[in-house]
Amino acid sequence: MKIGFLGFGKSNRSLLKYLLNHQEAKFFVSEAKTLDGETKKFLEEHSVEYEEGGHTEKLLDCDVVYVSPGIKPDTSMIELLSSRGVKLSTELQFFLDNVDPKKVVGITGTDGKSTATALMYHVLSGRGFKTFLGGNFGTPAVEALEGEYDYYVLEMSSFQLFWSERPYLSNFLVLNISEDHLDWHSSFKEYVDSKLKPAFLQTEGDLFVYNKHIERLRNLEGVRSRKIPFWTDENFATEKELIVRGKKYTLPGNYPYQMRENILAVSVLYMEMFNELESFLELLRDFKPLPHRMEYLGQIDGRHFYNDSKATSTHAVLGALSNFDKVVLIMCGIGKKENYSLFVEKASPKLKHLIMFGEISKELAPFVGKIPHSIVENMEEAFEKAMEVSEKGDVILLSPGGASFDMYENYAKRGEHFREIFKRHGGDEV
């Protein structure tokens, strides 16, 4: 048997390492970029054939090809492999095929899925279960096969789910779905279908917790599992309270909107799994939200600074804006072919001033109209402009609405740069 890897990112690297120890086969790695010396050495030491700098028809000799999640469906090699009948799969699918589906908790959504995944891991671990945290978040799922766990909590991206043939799992949570990654998916429908794929594979004994608003995007009648919606009369959250199964619980802190949605969604799932919420609320007290997600940095001259660098869609930006009255907003990065006219219409009541830089400024600028706005070159200039147009008591929010790759390695590097500038300007950190 010959196993191929189309792309050699984190997930395929972990899968190859696992297969080298557990399966007799020939392996072939095809990477569009140049492989580093350490990677080449590893492949050569394990007699793994490879190519770099592009993909060739050598992949056609493989019985199965594992696709790196980021590779687009319209890639010419994908089209060639499909036309020749070569089986395509993913590291995630391999994991799901080799684990008890009742132990898997899969979480997806356009915004908030990393935080919700981390929260689910936190409460399960706090309850005493040996829990694995991974998937699109951190560690590739296949690495969990080297150990024994009570639960596997996985963040699942639309890319992973698109390429996975049959991602079946017993516990599935969808936080929200809005337009995103339309630069990757051929349509919004394809994006929605990818996100919801596991739900339509579930059976009667499984659990599907989802945002009620999803019903406007896709008919869920074909889902056979137990369907529990939130943002309903029975399951919702206010600034102070959590309502689950119609019963009120006091939240143990003040949380921004997106975090309240995460707490609500995970609490509904937790209630369905364990039939009580008291332990969840106690464990919630100790949960530390992830950085770069509505992270309050502190003050400079009475101005309040928030780092929301993880917000890479306009839906996420609107969620951030909902926490404030008037905001000096910094947007940047690479847009995702969203409806910017609609975004500006919804955002404008919240905007004192909009500051833009990077690729997204070209897409946004035609729609900003009479909103006070500035286009600058980089984060340094954006920070200076924000100080200039703001006054004591104002909120200055970095919530980019675009991917980071035009100017930064990732969203975390972008957020760290914003924090670094904040410190350099004498920011009083909390």
Curated annotation (Swiss-Prot):
Q: In which pathway does it act?
A: Cell wall biogenesis; peptidoglycan biosynthesis
Reactions catalysed = UDP-N-acetyl-alpha-D-muramoyl-L-alanine + D-glutamate + ATP = UDP-N-acetyl-alpha-D-muramoyl-L-alanyl-D-glutamate + ADP + phosphate + H(+)
- Keyword flag Cell membrane: no
Q: Report the subcellular localization.
A: Cytoplasm
Q: Work out whether the entry's keyword set contains Zinc-finger.
A: no
Per the UniProt entry, the Enzyme Commission number(s) are 6.3.2.9
Using the UniProt record, give the first listed, main subcellular location: cytoplasm
Q: Which Pfam families match?
A: Mur_ligase_C, Mur_ligase_M, MurD-like_N, MurD_N
Q: Which residues bind ATP?
A: 109-115
Q: In Gene Ontology terms, what is one molecular function of this protein?
A: UDP-N-acetylmuramoylalanine-D-glutamate ligase activity
GO BP annotations of the record are: cell division; cell wall organization; peptidoglycan biosynthetic process; regulation of cell shape
Annotated Gene Ontology cellular component terms? cytoplasm
Matches recorded under PANTHER family: UDP-N-ACETYLMURAMOYLALANINE--D-GLUTAMATE LIGASE
User: What's this protein's function?
Assistant: Cell wall formation. Catalyzes the addition of glutamate to the nucleotide precursor UDP-N-acetylmuramoyl-L-alanine (UMA).
Q: Of which family is this protein a member?
A: Belongs to the MurCDEF family.
User: Could you tell me what this protein is called?
Assistant: UDP-N-acetylmuramoylalanine--D-glutamate ligase
Q: What is the lineage of its organism?
A: Bacteria, Thermotogati, Thermotogota, Thermotogae, Thermotogales
